[in-house]
Structure formats: structure tokens, C-alpha cells
């Protein structure tokens, strides 16, 4: 995970526990009724310019990003959390300051016939992939 200068991108911005209702899943009842999805994102970016200038435009506006992620979960149905995670990674990487992202999609209401706490998928995507 390198910044464009060749230096490692050590700075991370984390948004955890974003909740949104989506109609994703393999089964008809999931797509019809919907359920809550929980999203965590970890963004790799260089925050030195923002810290030096104290200027929001030099970093990621996490409030706006949260709204865009929420909209991405709430829109266009997909069958797999893998597809949803890829969509969310694309939202994060559309921010020019972001070098890489880890996206975790939790599906706590997944239709599993035994007791469980959560099912989740984490993906890593880079601007250079």
C-alpha cells in the first residue's frame, strides 16, 4: 500500500457500523422484504496536506462518504454480498484522496438455519488494482 510518492500510506480513516436497509440476497424473500446491512470501511490516504492546511477539501468528507455508502446499499438489488462489497469499494475509491480501501459488509440477518452472531465479508481494493 504505497502512496503516489512511493511512501507507504500509513494514515487510515475508519467508518464503522454504517447501517442501511437493502434488498440483497439470493432468496426471493430477502429481495422482497429487505434487511439491515452493516458496513465498515477503512480508507488508506495521506492526511498530511489536510493536517497542514486544516482544509476539508484536502481529505475525505466522511459525512458525505457515509451518505453515498448508505445510498449504495439501499439501491439496486444484488444477490451476493461480494457484489455489494465491490460496489462500496468503488464508492470509496471514487474519492481522489483514497489510495486503498478495506470494506466489510455484515449481514446479521442472513438466512442461516443455526444460531449465529454475524456473517461478513471483507475485501481489500486499491486504486492500483
Predicted regions and their residues:
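N-terminal, polar/charged subdomain of small-to-medium soluble alpha/beta proteins
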Residues: 1-129
Amino acid at each position: 500500500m504505497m502512496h503516489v510518492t512511493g511512501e507507504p500510506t500509513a494514515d487510515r480513516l475508519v467508518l464503522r457500523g454504517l447501517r442501511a436497509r437493502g434488498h440483497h440476497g439470493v432468496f426471493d424473500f430477502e429481495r422482497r422484504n429487505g434487511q439491515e446491512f452493516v458496513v465498515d470501511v477503512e480508507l488508506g490516504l495521506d492526511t498530511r496536506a489536510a493536517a497542514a492546511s486544516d482544509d476539508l477539501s484536502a481529505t475525505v468528507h466522511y459525512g458525505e462518504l457515509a451518505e453515498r455508502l448508505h445510498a449504495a446499499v439501499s439501491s439496486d438489488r444484488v444477490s451476493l454480498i461480494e457484489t455489494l462489497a465491490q460496489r462500496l469499494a468503488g464508492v470509496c475509491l471514487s474519492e481522489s484522496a483514497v489510495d486503498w480501501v478495506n470494506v466489510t459488509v455484515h449481514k446479521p440477518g442472513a438466512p442461516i438455519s443455526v444460531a449465529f452472531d454475524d456473517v461478513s465479508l471483507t475485501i481489500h481494493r486499491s486504486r492500483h488494482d
